[in-house]
A protein has these predicted regions:
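An acidic/histidine-cluster motif and surrounding catalytic segment
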Residues: 1-91, 101-128
């Protein structure tokens, strides 16, 4: 389990959610290994590949609720690949999951670029 300032991160997540017109209800972060993430991806999404984040959206109206599975193994390797600290990449993935709960997709080149831009804007508000 990563050492996070939960109050600071929670306040940040609530502020980002509010920018998109949402309150935060119950968001569970499940930090796991690549193997656990792959098992979840196979079982629930039918995808046979590793990924850094899987978001299950249970939101209602304007309240964000969901489970966000985050592979700490992939976060670590992604951080090394892009020259970021582990904490910086972890916060990118945390907010990526939150943005999915707001309805932001990332399947097409256009929506992926939008997601990256929104991640950057959010990360600018949180100095890690």
């Amino acid at each position: 389990m990563p050492a996070l300032d939960e109050r600071k991160v929670g306040k940040w997540i609530r502020a980002v959610a509010a920018e998109y017109g949402f309150a935060v209800g119950n968001i569970n972060y499940i930090f796991c290994s690549d193997e656990r993430e792959l098992a979840v991806n196979r079982e629930f999404l039918g995808h046979d590949y590793y990924t850094d984040v899987i978001t299950f959206d249970y939101s209602t109206a304007q309240t964000l609720n969901g489970d966000i599975f985050i592979s700490l193994d992939t976060v670590r390797s992604n951080a090394e690949m892009v020259g970021a600290t582990f904490e910086q990449e972890l916060m990118r993935i945390v907010i990526h999951g939150v943005l999915h709960l707001t309805g932001q997709g990332d399947k097409s080149p256009e929506t992926k670029a939008e997601m990256t831009e929104k991640e950057e804007r959010a990360l600018d508000k949180l100095k890690v």
